[in-house]
């Protein structure tokens, strides 16, 4: 079975930062990293939404925005509106390309906002059926669904630097084993 690493932890602990650091190191070693990263969008120190970026093309989309701040259609989600069309325009194709083209698939994040898209759910399922290594950030409310499918690494402020080294080591060993 291919390596599956699921990173979880409280908001703001550095899950996306850790995954980006691992992806940069893997890329630096000449491996192809594909998939998607989600980042907060802030204005005046206040979070106003989330942006998704395809790792292979750099294409960006708006995952979610505060209600009343975007012209994009979407599904109400607490104080946000989730833009399902943007998930399906940017994240889903990036994930599917990664299954074919990448050495390591990154999905940040698998969570309730992303799961408003049935196509996103299907794309995650396709990754899990593939033989490609996966590094994914999983929302704490979803982690129990993924726990049986791979390694779960719960980040804290105290362990995040050590976890970076552990996860990078696991990923590199897997990739070197695949390439021989």
Swiss-Prot record:
One Pfam family here: NTPase_1
CDD domains the UniProt entry points to: RecA-like_Thep1 (cd19482)
Residues reported in the UniProt entry to bind ATP: 9-16, 104-111
Keywords: ATP-binding, Hydrolase, Nucleotide-binding
SUPFAM superfamilies, sorted: P-loop containing nucleoside triphosphate hydrolases (SSF52540)
Classification via InterPro entries: AAA+_ATPase (IPR003593), Nuc-triphosphatase_THEP1 (IPR004948), P-loop_NTPase (IPR027417)
Broad EC category: hydrolase
Catalytic activity: a ribonucleoside 5'-triphosphate + H2O = a ribonucleoside 5'-diphosphate + phosphate + H(+)
Keyword ATP-binding: yes
EC number(s) on file: 3.6.1.15
Any GO molecular function: ATP hydrolysis activity
NCBIfam families linked to this entry: PRK13695.1
Family membership noted in the UniProt record: Belongs to the THEP1 NTPase family.
Function: Has nucleotide phosphatase activity towards ATP, GTP, CTP, TTP and UTP. May hydrolyze nucleoside diphosphates with lower efficiency.
Descriptive protein name: Nucleoside-triphosphatase THEP1
């Amino acid at each position: 079975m291919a390596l599956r690493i699921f990173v979880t932890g409280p908001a703001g602990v550095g899950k996306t930062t850790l995954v980006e650091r691992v992806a940069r190191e893997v890329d630096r070693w000449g491996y192809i990293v594909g998939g998607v990263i989600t980042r907060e969008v802030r204005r005046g120190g206040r979070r106003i939404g989330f942006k998704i970026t395809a790792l292979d093309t750099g294409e960006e989309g708006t995952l979610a925005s505060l209600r009343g701040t975007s012209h994009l259609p979407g599904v109400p989600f607490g104080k946000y509106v989730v833009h399902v069309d943007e998930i399906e325009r940017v994240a889903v194709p990036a994930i599917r390309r990664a299954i074919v083209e990448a050495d390591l698939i990154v999905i940040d994040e698998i969570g309730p906002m992303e799961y408003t898209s049935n196509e996103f759910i299907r794309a995650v399922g396709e990754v899990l059926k593939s033989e490609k290594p996966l590094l994914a950030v999983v929302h704490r409310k979803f982690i129990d669904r993924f726990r049986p499918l791979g390694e779960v690494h719960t980040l804290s402020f105290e362990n995040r630097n050590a976890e970076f080294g552990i996860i990078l080591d696991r990923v590199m060993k897997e990739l070197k084993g695949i390439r021989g």
